[in-house]
Amino acid sequence: MRTRRLPLVLAMLAALPVVAAQESTTGPVAPAISVVHCGHLFDSETGRMLGETSITVAGDRIKAVRPGAPEAGVKVIELGNATCLPGLIDSHVHLTMQTSPTQYSDQFRWNISDYAIRSTVYAQRTLMAGFTTVRNVADMANESIALRNAINAGIVPGPRIFSSGKAIGSTGGHADPTDGYRMDLAGDPNPSGGIINSPDDAWKAVRQHYKDGADLIKIMPSGGVLDESASVDNAQMTIEEIKAVVAAAHDYGFTVAAHAHGAEAIRRAVIGGVDSIEHGTFMNDEDMKLMKEHGTWLVPTIIAGKYVGEMAEKPGYYPAQVAAKAKMVGPIIQGTAGNAYRAGVKIAFGTDAAVYPHGQNAKEFQYMVEAGMPTAFVLQTATTHAAQLLKHEKDFGSVTAGKFADIIAVPGDPLADITLMMKVEFVMKAGVVYKRDSMTVEPLTQSAPTPSKAQGDELKGY
């Protein structure tokens, strides 16, 4: 990666919203008022399936939701007998990268522009899969912040993004991008680059993230699977460092997500006050009890664990040390998620997209059901629960008057067959129709809308 060019490239990417202000966007938008008519509606607030429903959309918001057919004389988006659901939320993605057998060498051949351009493709695949909002938890050089800005400006299609920017962790830990590489090639990251080794460093790192335009903070208090270090589960941050990150983050209104596989790292993160545990592979009964007491969310990412376990069996796909760790995590993570559900831990949907190919996010629903979670509950994890984790339950997470018009549709009853969530045929985000397979929808030809205040810079997409 040509790091000398990085400041210039990032400056260019960050300027995208300014460019957008000088251009006339041409993307499709919903008319001033239209009605989405579907055979069934999943009520994510109650977990019940409702019958025939008409959803009135005014601009980017839902104006009314009523049973039955639409009134005469209104513009109708007719979805027949399809089931409508709220736009889905994936609480753990990495839109600026994707798994590949060359991923470890690519970072020395590609510059940050290569990753940023590819991210626009991954974002569109995610939106087409029905995910209208995502939490992007870690990138390499804040390129997901530039992607968020470009989507908000109407330059490229994609989900509403809440971005952490770079992750924060310790020297030699899972967040250290130089781990396993020569210092003269990779350098020695400091707090401005997300690497900390004291509470004072933590404050500087969080403040830098605020300056960079992040929407939340992601920390790495445990080892991980895909880095080239030896351990997947060792604790890599002290409680004092975690508490400092959380205190600084809360000063800026940020939530804190913690990547943690190991039991001790999970314990420290929960005591330190984080909002969510990502993965939680080796959590024990004490961890689950602590999480329930503290109200800490679990974002399970079962699909990622299964995928790395499968790829680890392919010779050469991962470095040997990575493959060994993947084989440890793969068989365990699904059972842990089921145990956490039965222990009463709060669960929000998240997949670790990029660890597996983008656009396959909905496979996680099937894996959660297989882990013993009720189907309605599983759908709620990607709607009301995830919205609560993001602290934006007033804006999205259910098909309710006043919220963003984020609506998707599948061809049948997902409560009876959860695999239908992998067959999304209709996607509307903030009143704009992006996908309409096999549906009767009038062409929409107006230019892209200016986001309302709750969707714009204050939300920052994440």
How would you describe each model-predicted region?
Residues 24-27, 41-54, 67, 374-379, ...:
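Acidic, glycine-enriched loop/beta-strand segments at the rims
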Residues 82-155, 171-178, 240, 264, ...:
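Metal-associated gating/positioning segment near the N- to mid-region
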Residues 27-32, 41, 46-85:
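Histidine-rich, glycine-flanked metal-binding segment
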Residues 107, 251-255, 320-321, 327-413:
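His/Asp/Glu-enriched, well-ordered alpha-helical/loop segment
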Residues 99-102, 144, 173-174, 227-229, ...:
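Histidine/acidic-residue-rich catalytic or RNA/ligand-binding cores of hydrolases
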Residues 118-143, 157-167, 214-227, 255, ...:
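Divalent metal-dependent hydrolysis catalytic cores, especially in the metallo-beta-lactamase
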Residues 97-115, 124, 171-190, 225-239, ...:
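Active-site gating loops and adjacent loop-to-helix segments of metal-dependent hydrolytic enzymes
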Residues 149-167, 232-258, 295, 299-303:
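Alpha-helix-loop-beta-strand connector modules within alpha/beta enzyme cores
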